[in-house]
Regions:
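Short beta-alpha connecting loops at secondary-structure transitions
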Residues: 57-65, 243-247, 352, 373-379, ...
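Flexible, glycine/charged-enriched surface loops at secondary-structure junctions
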Residues: 272-273, 321-326, 484, 535-538
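C-terminal and late-domain segments of enzyme folds
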Residues: 434-438, 442-538
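Short low-complexity, flexible loop/linker segments enriched in glycine and/or proline
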Residues: 52-55, 225, 393-396, 497-499
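Active-site proximal loops enriched in glycine and acidic residues that flank catalytic Cys/His/Asp
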Residues: 11, 41, 214, 241, ...
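Cysteine-nucleophile active-site neighborhood
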Residues: 17-20, 24-28, 32, 343-438, ...
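Flexible phosphate-sensing "switch/lid" loops adjacent to ATP/NTP-binding sites
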Residues: 1-323, 333-349, 356-357, 363-370, ...
Length: 538
C-alpha cells in the first residue's frame, strides 16, 4: 500500500460504549487481511498521563515497553493484535498543550499569538500522522476518548475535520453510538443516535460507518431508518449487541462485514474474507471448557477495571488450561488472621495484587501468610511480591517489625527499600521505574523452567525493591531470589521451591499476556491451581 490510511473512532450519546474494543477489533480484522496496523488513543484530559489518576476514577494504568503510563485501552490494543505499543500510541490534551507551550517558549512560532486553532489542532494532526510517516503503517487507527459534544473533545473533532478534508479518500470516521431499549414501551430508540450524528455533522464531520451499541438485536428496519436519517450507507450501519466476551467482538464485526465496508470506502478491493482461524480456535476452546478454576484476587480496589490486565491474563490462562476462570475479589482491608480462612475458602489459587500506599497492605500480608502455610498456589505481583517478602521476614526470619520504607520509613528491617536512583525524586508523575527491563533467571529455578529460557524482558512500574542486604538470610530460610536485573542487580523474582506454587514478581507480567500468546507464568499458575483443586476436592 503506497499511502497510509487513517481511521478515526469517535463516540456519542454516552461514554464507556467500548470504543477501545471496537478499535481493537478493527485492528484485528485488518491485521488478519495482512495489513500492517497500529492503534493510538487520544485522551481529552489535561493530565500529562494517567499515571497519577485514582484507579477508582480511571481504572488500570497500563505501561508500554518504552515506559509510558497510558490508558487501559492500550492493553486491549495489545491483547487483540499482539503488537506492542509505545509512547506514540498514547496522547493526552496535557501532552499536546505542553508540546505547544514548549515550542512557544523555544521561539518556534516567531512571536505569533498561540491559539487552539491552528496551533493545538496542528499538534494533534502532527501526532496522528506521525506513526504513518515514521513507521509506514498501512492503517493508523485513532480512538478519540470522550463523547461528541464534550468541551474537552472540541479540538480533536476540529483536527479530525481538517484531516478528513486534507487526506480525502485516505481518511474514514467510525462513529459508535448507543441505541437504548425502553422496557416499558418495548422499543429500541434511534433518536439518541440521530442527535449524536447531527452533533458530529455540526462540527463538519460526516460519519462513514456507524456502529450501534445495543442490548437487543436490531432488525433491518431499524438499521435502514438510521442509515436514512444519518446519511450513511445501509451496509455501513453495523450493530454491536452485548456479547458474553469482548473476544467475540472481532468475529461479530467480521460477520456483519465491517472490514469489507471499510476497505470499500477506501477504494480497496476487499478480496477473500480471512478465516480468523487461531482467534476462533481460542473462542472454541473457551466455550468447550466445562470445569472451573476459582482464583481469589486480594487487593484494595474493588473496581474491576483497576486490575483489568490481570483479570484478562487469568481468563486467557484458564482457556489454555481448558477451564473457565472464576474470579473473586477479596478486599485486603477486611482481611485479618481471624477471618482469612473463611475469606479465602473455596479458592484454588490466590493472586496478591499490585497497588500503592498503606491502605490494605496488612491484609495482603495476612493472605500471604495463610497461603504460604497452607500451600495454596500464590502469585504476588509488584506490591504483592513485596508483601510476600515482608510476611516471610516477620514470620520466618523473626523480624516482627519488618516492613517497606514506603509504609514505615523508620523500620530497622527494611526488607523492601526505595531504589537508590529514586531517593532524590520529588515529582510523582512519570518518575518511577517504568517500562521493559531485562531479567536473568537462575538456572534450575521454577520460573526458569516455566519461561524455558534464562533471559527475559518484563515491564515495571515501581519505586521500591527487595533489599539485597537481606538476601542471604532469605535464601537460607527457603525463599530464593531467582530473577535479577543484570545491570542494577535488583531482585525481580522470588520463589519458595518447596511449595506448590509460591512466586512473586516485581514486574507486571500481565502486560505481556495476549489472546494468542498467554503469559507462561499465568498459564502455569492456573495449571497448578487446577492441580491444587484436585488435591483438595479429589
Amino acid at each position: 500500500m503506497t499511502e497510509t490510511k487513517y481511521i478515526f473512532v469517535t463516540g456519542g450519546v454516552v461514554s464507556s460504549l467500548g470504543k477501545g474494543i471496537i478499535s481493537s477489533s478493527i485492528g484485528k480484522l485488518l491485521q488478519a487481511r495482512g495489513y500492517n496496523i497500529t492503534i493510538q488513543k487520544f485522551d481529552p484530559y489535561i493530565n500529562i498521563d494517567p499515571g497519577t489518576l485514582n484507579p477508582y476514577e480511571h481504572g488500570e494504568c497500563y505501561v508500554t515497553v518504552d515506559g509510558m503510563e497510558t490508558d487501559l485501552d492500550l492493553g486491549h490494543y495489545e491483547r487483540f493484535t499482539d503488537i506492542q505499543t509505545t509512547k506514540a500510541n498514547s496522547l493526552t490534551t496535557g501532552r499536546i498543550y505542553k508540546a505547544v507551550i514548549d515550542k512557544e517558549r523555544h521561539g518556534d512560532y516567531l512571536g505569533k499569538t498561540i491559539q487552539v486553532v491552528p496551533h493545538i489542532t496542528d499538534e494533534i494532526k502532527r501526532n496522528v500522522k506521525l506513526l504513518g510517516k515514521k513507521c509506514g503503517y498501512d492503517f493508523v487507527i485513532t480512538e478519540i476518548g470522550g463523547t461528541i459534544g464534550d468541551i474537552e473533545s472540541a479540538p480533536y473533532m476540529e483536527a479530525i475535520r481538517q484531516l478528513k478534508w486534507e487526506l480525502g479518500k485516505n481518511a474514514l470516521n467510525v462513529h459508535l453510538t448507543y441505541v437504548p431499549y425502553l422496557k416499558a414501551a418495548g422499543e429500541l430508540k434511534t433518536k439518541p443516535t440521530q442527535h449524536s450524528v447531527k452533533e458530529l455533522q455540526s462540527v463538519g464531520i460526516q460519519p462513514d460507518i456507524l456502529i450501534l451499541r445495543t442490548e437487543k438485536h436490531l432488525n433491518d428496519d431499524i438499521r435502514k431508518k438510521v442509515a436514512a436519517f444519518c446519511n450513511v450507507d445501509f451496509d455501513c450501519v453495523i450493530q454491536s449487541e452485548d456479547l458474553p466476551s469482548i473476544y467475540e467482538v472481532p468475529v461479530n464485526m467480521q460477520n456483519q462485514g465491517l472490514d469489507t465496508a471499510m476497505l470499500k470506502k477506501f477504494g480497496i478491493e476487499p478480496g477473500e474474507k480471512p478465516t480468523l482461524g487461531p482467534w476462533k480456535s481460542f473462542l472454541e476452546r473457551r466455550d468447550k471448557a466445562t470445569e472451573e478454576v476459582h482464583i481469589g484476587l486480594v487487593g484494595k480496589y474493588d473496581l474491576q477495571d483497576a486490575y483489568k490486565s490481570i483479570r484478562e491474563a487469568l481468563y486467557q490462562a484458564g482457556t489454555y488450561n481448558d477451564h473457565k476462570t472464576v474470579l473473586t475479589f477479596i478486599n485486603s482491608e477486611n482481611l485479618t488472621d481471624e477471618n482469612v480462612a473463611e475469606k479465602l475458602a473455596g479458592q484454588d489459587g490466590i493472586v496478591i495484587c499490585p497497588g500503592f500506599g498503606q491502605r490494605g497492605i496488612e491484609g495482603k500480608v495476612v493472605a500471604a501468610k495463610y497461603t504460604r502455610t497452607h500451600n495454596i498456589p500464590t502469585f504476588g505481583i509488584c506490591l504483592g511480591m513485596q508483601m510476600m517478602v515482608i510476611e516471610f521476614a516477620r514470620n520466618v526470619l523473626g523480624y516482627k517489625d519488618a516492613n517497606s520504607r514506603e509504609m514505615n520509613e523508620k523500620t530497622p528491617h527494611n526488607v523492601i527499600d526505595i531504589m537508590e536512583e529514586q531517593k532524590n525524586i520529588t515529582d510523582m508523575g512519570g518518575t518511577m521505574r517504568l517500562g521493559a527491563y531485562e531479567c536473568v533467571l537462575k538456572q534450575g529455578s521454577r520460573v526458569c523452567d516455566i519461561y524455558g529460557k534464562t533471559h527475559i524482558q518484563e515491564r515495571h512500574r515501581h519505586r521500591y525493591e527487595f533489599n539485597n542486604d537481606f538476601q542471604k538470610e532469605y535464601e537460607r530460610a527457603g525463599m530464593m531470589c531467582v530473577g535479577r536485573n543484570p545491570e542494577s542487580d535488583l531482585v525481580e523474582i522470588v520463589e519458595i521451591p518447596g511449595l506448590n506454587w509460591y512466586i512473586g514478581t516485581q514486574f507486571h507480567p500481565e502486560y505481556q499476556s495476549t489472546v494468542l500468546h498467554p503469559h507462561p507464568l499465568f498459564v502455569d499458575f492456573i495449571k497448578h491451581s487446577i492441580d491444587n483443586q484436585k488435591k483438595v476436592y479429589g
